[in-house]
Amino acid sequence: MSGTMPLQPTFYGFIGDTTDALIIFEACLSGKLFHVPRRPHDRERQDLIKSGNIFVYEEHASGIKRWTDSISWSPSRILGNYLLYRELEKPFPPGEKKRARGRNGKSTTQSGGITKSRPRNSVPFQTGLEHGNEYTTVPSDDERHLVGSLVDSYDFKEQGLVKKTISITYQGVPHHLVSYYHVEDVKAGLLPSPVDDPRLRGVVPRTELLTGQNFRAPIEEAQHGTYLSGAYMPNMDHQYAPIGFPTHTQQPALQQQPQQQPQPQHQPQLQYQPQPHQHQPQLQYQPQQQHQPQQQYRPQPQHQPQLQYQPQALHPTAHGYPQSYGQTWW
């Protein structure tokens, strides 16, 4: 019965991280989404194996032991808890071992000999890259999330598909997820994330999916959506926010520090302004500001009798003239 019914993908979009995949698995277990009952037939593959389609199947009920789609894929590479494959320009010749080519663009055979070099193809991530050109710079982290280490190690098909797979076990039964996407579709934000689908709002993976798996990498916390689409923008804003806020709070502190530093330097200058004039008597008489008569008689140094009789009024002793004179000027 299932062989005659048209096959439909489980979900349309892009699976960015492990949490996205667990949401899809949970939606299938709870009945919000559906497992596929079989593999696509040859006549269906052209319409079903395309960017954005995601298939989830349960191994026992479907009888699927190996998912086939008639596309020539590169060897798999690990990316977190996923396996990545990239579509090849042409399949490997029969009997040839699938070896990655070296840095010089030449591939080695199983016997260790060198075959003729083949031009490298790469998805044009960087501006100015065209078909046949090599990477001039190392791909960014966002690009690594899309192709992993499958950059230019094989003869990849230009604008070819990427296959991304992940598996879980629930109550002893294996469940598999197979997704397809074009790199440019993900970069352009054309493939929605599971959290963007209204049907999947409020879907929380059950405990068995979170703790009962043998994942290679820890499950991401609070990271949903694609790496380049709008669904991932809140996380990007959260990363840039801590950089901006401290700078605004630190700016007034940095402005206050240079203002406070010169203040103690100017204060001693204000106190010691009479020093450049070298009026030592003024420095001695600063603590004796209460004696106004002495300050009034400063401009009359020639009148010695007046200076001698000033201490007489304060000190009536007859033998105190030399002592009062010394106290007044020295």
Curated annotation (Swiss-Prot):
Superkingdom of source: Eukaryota
Coiled coil regions, renumbered to chain: none
Protein name: Global transcription regulator sge1
Xref: InterPro entries: Gti1/Pac2 (IPR018608)
Entry keywords, A to Z: Activator, Nucleus, Transcription, Transcription regulation, Virulence
Localization annotation: Nucleus
Compositional bias of kind Low complexity: 250-306
Organism: Fusarium oxysporum f. sp. lycopersici (strain 4287 / CBS 123668 / FGSC 9935 / NRRL 34936) (Fusarium vascular wilt of tomato)
